[in-house]
A protein has these predicted regions:
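Short, surface-exposed loop/turn segments at beta-strand-coil junctions that are enriched for proline
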Residues: 404-412
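Active-site-adjacent substrate/metal-binding segments within catalytic domains
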Residues: 4-101, 105-141, 232-272
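Aromatic sugar-binding surface patches on proteins
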Residues: 395-404
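Short, aromatic- and glycine-rich surface loops/edge beta-strands on solvent-exposed regions
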Residues: 1-6, 413-424
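Extracellular Ig-like/FN3 beta-sandwich strand-entry sites
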Residues: 350, 367, 411-417
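Active-site region of glycoside hydrolase catalytic domains
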Residues: 2-4, 71, 116-232, 285
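Substrate-binding clefts and catalytic carboxylate motifs of secreted carbohydrate-active enzymes
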Residues: 132, 162, 192-386, 390-396
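Short beta-strand elements
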Residues: 7-20, 31, 389-392, 427-440
């Protein structure tokens, strides 16, 4: 008490931890290297509609999917979301709400600096806070007179935020400082040979796009615009024609239901293979990966695992299979290596693949059983198989086996499935599959 009056006080929770990035772009949480299996998140287009009754079920589902980090990009959420992440132990990568093209004049820099200082003051004591970005994508392409955001605005914002938080990493913007987006078949060509990509340590957007279920689609596209698609209407609600038919090369099909299924199947396979591809590069050099997005922010054609009404896209089940702490997967030895595309091998060749065993746990797991088999989908004949026991080393990504299957004339035109499983006693740690086709 001071002169009979109680002093002003502020109560807040805080956490003491250390999250640092080394020179190779790897993350260390309390001196332990951590592989970040992340998720981009936006609760709603209108933040006022969101609250704990929405966030908590979302985050509990994420934790069951083994997601350990969230990236809030291009906006801020209400304080309660960050408090919930504090309690649940979800690591937060917060991006200042700047995206694409803004002015780089002195007035803009001054006002943005005040705002980023406020953002830092609001969030820096949250236990969940791990890292910052001052801008989502500061370098805009296809503009004849683009502003100098990266070399002028971003550096001022970084220095301003560092006055509030001198400890955590402050990142200048995507496509810089070891940070990149890959959206195969959505924002980039689905025929990209990913072996030619230079992959940095932090992939803060990966994913694809598909059309939500018919029940959801009917809530925002008028019935008379549904089929055949009225493309102007569909593009207004998020379907980009060139991305769908030129990048993803999705087939329209003979009905609206077929079109929806074709887009959802492509997204599911593309995202699954993007995850496998990035996890096979664990610490070589990939250290973090964030799917774009958890859910659609409004009724739209989007990139979420869930649509606006939290109805799952097909990709939801596919992602659950490959975001597990332990992962077994096959990497076909094929060139060019295209994610989301059917893998074609020819008669007279051998189907060859590396079998990966990935363990994100901090403990080794001894005496696990790894099994794989290749089955002819046309005849159900098992073409080859193997099983053996091994120790999964802590926090590792290894190739303990290879598949080599000569392809004879009898397999011409056949589709084959590769089934893989890692188990410990009666517990299945990872179960996965992939497909390839044999052509003449």
């Amino acid at each position: 008490l001071v002169l009979g009056w109680q002093e002003d006080t502020v109560k807040c929770r805080f956490g003491i931890k250390e999250i640092v990035q080394d020179d190779a772009g790897q993350w260390y949480l309390n001196n332990k290297r951590i592989f970040v299996r992340g998720m981009r998140y936006i609760s709603r287009r209108w933040m006022s509609e969101a609250g704990e009754e929405m966030w908590k079920p979302d985050f509990e589902k994420m934790i069951r999917m083994n997601i350990n980090s969230i990236r809030i990009g291009s906006h801020m959420e209400k304080d309660g979301l960050y408090s919930l992440c504090d309690e649940l132990g979800l690591l937060m990568w917060q991006v200042f709400p700047l995206h694409y093209c803004v002015s780089d004049d002195d007035d803009m820099i001054s006002r943005a600096s005040d705002m980023i200082r406020d953002m830092g003051m609001m969030l820096t004591n949250h236990a969940c806070m791990g890292m910052w970005s001052v801008y989502k994508e500061p370098e805009i392409y296809q503009l004849p007179d683009k502003p100098n955001n990266y070399f002028r605005l971003c550096h001022v914002l970084k220095e301003t935020l560092k006055t509030v938080d001198p400890v955590r990493w402050v990142h200048l913007g995507d496509y810089r400082e070891g940070v990149m987006n890959i959206m195969i078949g959505c924002c980039s060509d689905g025929d990209t040979d990913v072996d030619d990509l230079i992959i940095p340590p932090n992939i803060v957007e990966f994913g694809s796009q598909s059309i939500p279920c018919l029940e959801t689609l009917r809530t925002f596209i008028p019935e008379d615009k549904l089929w055949p698609p009225h493309w102007d209407t569909w593009e207004y609600w998020g379907l980009f024609y060139s991305n769908t038919f030129e990048f993803a090369k999705v087939e329209l099909g003979n009905s609206l239901e077929e079109f929806i299924e074709n887009t959802q199947e492509y997204e599911a396979v593309s995202v699954k293979e993007q995850i496998e591809f990035l996890r096979m590069k664990k610490y070589d050099p990939v250290s973090s990966m964030y799917l774009y997005y958890w859910s659609d922010a409004c009724p739209m054609i989007g990139s979420g695992l869930l649509d606006y009404y939290r109805r799952p896209y097909k990709v939801y089940d596919y992602m659950q299979k490959v975001y597990t702490p332990v992962l077994v997967c096959a990497q076909p030895c094929i060139h060019p290596y295209k994610l989301g595309r059917e893998k074609i091998f020819h008669v007279g060749m051998s189907y060859t693949a590396r079998v990966w065993a990935i363990n994100d746990n901090y403990e080794s797991i001894s005496d696990v059983l790894l099994q794989w088999k290749v089955t002819d989908c046309e005849t159900d004949e098992i073409l080859c198989r193997n099983s053996f026991r091994l120790e999964l080393l802590a926090d590792s990504a290894e190739i303990p086996d290879h598949i080599v299957l000569p392809l004879g004339e009898e397999l011409s035109g056949h589709r084959c499935r590769v089934d893989m499983k890692i188990s410990s006693g009666n517990e299945v740690l990872s179960e996965n599959d992939s497909y390839f086709r044999v052509e003449p």
